[in-house]
């Protein structure tokens, strides 16, 4: 090895040593060293990772002890004895012990994770366990049926919960859920005491809520109706009218959504009161038999005062929305009683699991329908209680981006928070939200 080669090797060694020194000196200036620093004066945003002190200040550290909770021991309570209710957003491990980080604020949560990362096992299950231990009522969507199988039994056996499994995959094995239940309930109270106007008003209110929810099935959006807005609005009033009539005059076993379809279909037929008179629809004849001050007559006023052709269009619009319920299996779930209604859900420890059939998306509209209706009925209960529920309720919407658009979802997130309603939306990517709600709705 000659002298030049020795010098070259020496220079390379010196350069390598200098490189290591520079890397070590600049390590404090790497991304790890500027976690909590803002760029400039916030021109590129002020978001940053929270410091350990901020995490400790924002979230409550709670020993996660499901084995003890199920025995009624060490239930989630703060130092002053208040029950800890909220969302598990993370955890810390300390030996064999796990400490959960719980957000107890009036907030909603968005959980994003690709398929297979453990959204259900490592996020949803701990949250449901905390909900049971702290006494929060909750509704959870379930695409595989695992959540209902695993935690339905736990909630009922160990935490004394009312449990309802709405199985859209096997409706014949599902618990019952008559979406007209509250209308029927308050109409019966009113019929037993005609002076109870509060019960009558509640029956009318829930009838209108149910009608609005049905009209908004799928892609129903008042902003997209355009020139057809009259027909959808009139169909909504017609549905509310027929629901009220069934609740008031129908037999006990016939007051369900399929009877609403059958009645509207029968009222489409025409009769000729006089050989020289123009044929009239039985719908008009039925309305003529009602007192002029009957609310069902008022609700159907838009359709009743339209031309025959417009009335046919209104009734056809209502029937088109009700077509989705014409399923021999679904009827076993929709045409009888209700295991858990909104009032029981808010006032007692209750859990509702909605099992989605991954192989049959035709039933996915029921998920949006059930969530919309339950949410709107809970708002009524909250308003009657001074604008806030007595006990927090949780909506665990697993695969939120998969099932059809929930009409008014944006307002659900904004209005529900102040009423002690927390929504936990679990998605795989923002693209799912953008597809269903558009870019503006996603944001």
Tell me the role of every PLM-derived stretch.
Residues 1-117, 121-129, 134, 172, ...:
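Basic- and hydrophobic-enriched, low-structure N-terminal and domain-boundary segments
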Residues 74, 88-96, 100-421:
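P-loop NTPase motor domains
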Residues 413-443:
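Conserved ATP-driven motor cores of ASCE-family P-loop NTPases powering translocation/secretion/packaging/pilus
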């Amino acid at each position: 090895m000659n002298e030049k080669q020795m010098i070259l090797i020496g220079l390379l060694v010196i350069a390598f040593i200098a490189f290591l020194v520079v890397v070590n000196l600049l390590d404090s200036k790497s991304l790890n060293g500027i976690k909590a620093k803002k760029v400039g004066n916030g021109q590129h945003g002020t978001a940053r990772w929270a410091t350990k002190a901020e995490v400790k200040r924002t979230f409550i550290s709670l020993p996660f002890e499901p084995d003890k909770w199920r025995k009624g021991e060490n239930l989630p309570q703060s130092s002053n004895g208040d029950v800890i209710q909220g969302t598990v957003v993370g955890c810390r491990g300390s030996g064999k012990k796990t400490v959960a980080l719980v957000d107890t604020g009036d907030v909603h949560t968005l959980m994003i994770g690709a398929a297979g990362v453990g959204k259900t096992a490592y996020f949803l299950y701990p949250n449901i366990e905390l909900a049971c231990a702290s006494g929060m009522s909750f509704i959870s969507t379930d695409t595989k049926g695992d959540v209902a199988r695993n935690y339905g039994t736990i909630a009922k056996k160990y935490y004394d919960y009312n449990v309802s499994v709405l199985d859209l995959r096997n409706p014949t094995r599902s618990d019952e859920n008559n979406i007209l239940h509250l209308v029927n309930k308050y109409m019966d109270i009113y019929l037993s005491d005609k002076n109870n106007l509060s019960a009558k008003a509640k029956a009318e209110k829930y009838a209108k809520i149910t009608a609005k929810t049905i009209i908004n099935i799928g892609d129903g959006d008042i902003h997209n109706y355009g020139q057809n807005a009259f027909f959808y609005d009139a169909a909504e009033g017609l549905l509310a009218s027929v629901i009220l009539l069934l609740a008031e005059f129908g037999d006990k076993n016939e007051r369900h959504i399929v009877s609403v379809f059958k009645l509207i279909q029968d009222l489409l037929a025409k009769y000729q009161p006089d050989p020289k008179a123009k044929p009239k629809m039985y719908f008009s004849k039925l309305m003529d038999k009602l007192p002029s001050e009957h609310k069902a007559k008022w609700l159907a006023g838009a359709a009743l005062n339209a031309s025959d052709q417009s009335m046919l269009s209104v009734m056809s619009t209502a029937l088109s929305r009700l077509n989705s319920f014409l399923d021999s299996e679904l009827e076993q779930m929709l045409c009888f009683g209700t295991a858990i209604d909104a009032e029981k859900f808010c006032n007692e420890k209750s859990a509702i699991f909605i099992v989605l059939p991954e192989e049959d998306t035709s039933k996915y509209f029921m998920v949006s329908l059930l969530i919309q209706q339950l949410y709107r009925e809970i708002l009524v209960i909250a308003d009657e209680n001074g604008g806030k529920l007595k006990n927090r309720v949780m909506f665990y919407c697993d695969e939120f981006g998969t099932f059809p658009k929930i009409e008014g979802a944006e307002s659900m997130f904004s209005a529900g928070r102040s009423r002690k309603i927390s929504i936990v939306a679990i998605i795989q990517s923002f693209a799912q939200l953008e597809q269903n709600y558009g870019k503006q709705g996603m944001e």
